[in-house]
């Protein structure tokens, strides 16, 4: 059973996006991000669908900060421990994305292209 809610916030990209194609030509991209907090770090999984999935891979890299809007859900995730307990995984299906703070290397390349 999933519980969904709307969420928006700034996150930091932790890993390279992973893409896969499901059904017939539906592109899905997913990767892990972190909310920028001082004391507790909260790592969540983002999922992008369709054209937005392709744009994310093209324009955003590791260590970029992005502003996202989407639906948050708690998914059951079985861990590989000896007692096989079920844990929860936070997953956000992103509907809109905006650049917030891009990494230094890409900013210089973009300026030199002008």
State what each model feature region is:
Residues 1-114:
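Single-stranded nucleic acid-binding surfaces, predominantly the OB-fold ssDNA-binding core
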